[in-house]
Amino acid sequence: MLTKQQKEEIIKKYQLHESDTGSPEVQIALLTERINRLNEHLQAHKKDFHSRRGLLKMVGQRRKLLNYLKNYDINRYRELIEKLGLRK
């Protein structure tokens, strides 16, 4: 679970302007952080299928947001996946 301070740091890093909290970039960055933390949890607790389902839902949501951003502005999409280290 992200603390309020960690969430604010991620928002500041990826926001497009001063009051931006809901742009696709910010949403994707927050989801990526939550996904990474849940992955660590699932490596320690292999039989936690409840959390695994939540992980799959988050990955699907991130996929939808990435597809939207890719169709809307390909340059912002490429910049974001480079920053987040997605797509090897």
Swiss-Prot record:
Keywords: Ribonucleoprotein, Ribosomal protein, RNA-binding, rRNA-binding. Part of the 30S ribosomal subunit. Forms a bridge to the 50S subunit in the 70S ribosome, contacting the 23S rRNA. This is Small ribosomal subunit protein uS15. One of the primary rRNA binding proteins, it binds directly to 16S rRNA where it helps nucleate assembly of the platform of the 30S subunit by binding and bridging several RNA helices of the 16S rRNA. Forms an intersubunit bridge (bridge B4) with the 23S rRNA of the 50S subunit in the ribosome. One of its GO terms (cellular component) is cytosolic small ribosomal subunit. GO terms for molecular function: rRNA binding; structural constituent of ribosome. It comes from Caldicellulosiruptor bescii (strain ATCC BAA-1888 / DSM 6725 / KCTC 15123 / Z-1320) (Anaerocellum thermophilum). InterPro entries: Ribosomal_uS15, Ribosomal_uS15_bac-type, uS15_NS1_RNA-bd_sf. PANTHER family: RIBOSOMAL PROTEIN S15, BACTERIAL AND ORGANELLAR (PTHR23321), SMALL RIBOSOMAL SUBUNIT PROTEIN US15M (PTHR23321:SF26).
